[in-house]
C-alpha cells in the first residue's frame, strides 16, 4: 500500500506494474489474507499501525478480486479504470499538435508494439501491450532469466515512451495539459 501510494504520485506506469504484481502475489498466496500476512507482509519492517493498514489494504484487494472474479487472472477494475485514463490520455496526446516529442517517441516505438501484438494478444490496446511487455521482462529479470539483446532494445524504447506518457499523466493530473491552441 505504501509503495503503491508513492508510485501513484510519481509514475502511473510503475504504479500499474506494481499493482499487477500485487494481484499476482495475492494469487500466488491463494487469495488468503493469513497466508499473505505470514509469508509476505510480516517480512517488512512495519510499525504495528502500518502492518494493520497494509493488511486492510490486502484484505480489500482480496475482496475485490473475489467479487470481480479475478482469483485466477485478469486485472482489478480499479486498475482497469486507471489504465483506461492512461489510454485516453495517449489518444489525446497523439491527436494534438502540441506534443511533437510524444508523437516522435510513439512512432519510434510503434514497430515494437506491432511486433509484440503480432506475437501476443492482437486485441490489446497499444499502451496495454507496452505495459504487458514491461511486466513480462520485469518477471523474467526477477527469475534471473536471460533477455535477448533485441528484447532489451525494444524494452529500452518502450520504457522511454511509457515514461514520457507517465510524466504527461502526472502533469495532466496536477497542472492540466492544454491540447489545443489558445486562438482556437
State the predicted function of each range:
Residues 67-95, 173-184:
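Charged low-complexity stretches with an acidic bias
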Residues 114-184:
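Glycine-rich, aromatic-bearing surface loops/beta-hairpins
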Amino acid at each position: 500500500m505504501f509503495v503503491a501510494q508513492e508510485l501513484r504520485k510519481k509514475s502511473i506506469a510503475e504504479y500499474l506494474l506494481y499493482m499487477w504484481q500485487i494481484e499476482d502475489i495475492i494469487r500466488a498466496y491463494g487469495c488468503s489474507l493469513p497466508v499473505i500476512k505470514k509469508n509476505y507482509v510480516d517480512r517488512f519492517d512495519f510499525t504495528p499501525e502500518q502492518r494493520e493498514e497494509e493488511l486492510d489494504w490486502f484484505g480489500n484487494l482480496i475482496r475485490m478480486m473475489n467479487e470481480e472474479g479475478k482469483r485466477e487472472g485478469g486485472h482489478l477494475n480499479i486498475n482497469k479504470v486507471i489504465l483506461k485514463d492512461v489510454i485516453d490520455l495517449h489518444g489525446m496526446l497523439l491527436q494534438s499538435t502540441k506534443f511533437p516529442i510524444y508523437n516522435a517517441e510513439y512512432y519510434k516505438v510503434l514497430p515494437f508494439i506491432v511486433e509484440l501484438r503480432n506475437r501476443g494478444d492482437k486485441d490489446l490496446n497499444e499502451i496495454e501491450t507496452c505495459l504487458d511487455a514491461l511486466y513480462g521482462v520485469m518477471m523474467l529479470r526477477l527469475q534471473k532469466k536471460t533477455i535477448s539483446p533485441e528484447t532489451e532494445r525494444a524494452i529500452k524504447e518502450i520504457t522511454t515512451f511509457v515514461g514520457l506518457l507517465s510524466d504527461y499523466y502526472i502533469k495532466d493530473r496536477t497542472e492540466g495539459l492544454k491540447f489545443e491552441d489558445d486562438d482556437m
